Amino acid sequence: MAAVSLSVSTVKPLGDRVFVKVSASEKRPRRLYFPDTAKEKPQVGEVVALGAGKRNDDGSRQELEVKVGDLLLYSKYAGTDVKLGTEEYVLLSEKDILAMVG
């Protein structure tokens, strides 16, 4: 089997999945504030790739509500963590997204 070099450009999410670059806490937008009393602070990330959308019963696709470049809030334990080189990413289902920022 030949080795495959993975990069952001080679990752294509399927269905309603979204590939998100995790934002380091120091790079989060300053307009976001999570109080110290919050037990689990949501994670912030930028959409870098999208799936085609969820398939409806009639076979058509339901378009995703997010687009590449959007900043998202998502639960700390949602999705599947992926590391490409030194960068951290997470593969989320659209239902795991809490909100868009901005």
UniProtKB/Swiss-Prot annotation:
It is found in: Cytoplasm. Heptamer of 7 subunits arranged in a ring. Interacts with the chaperonin GroEL. This is Co-chaperonin GroES. GO terms for biological process: chaperone cofactor-dependent protein refolding. It comes from the Bacteria. GO terms for cellular component: cytoplasm. InterPro entries: Chaperonin_GroES (IPR020818), Chaperonin_GroES_sf (IPR037124), GroES-like_sf (IPR011032).
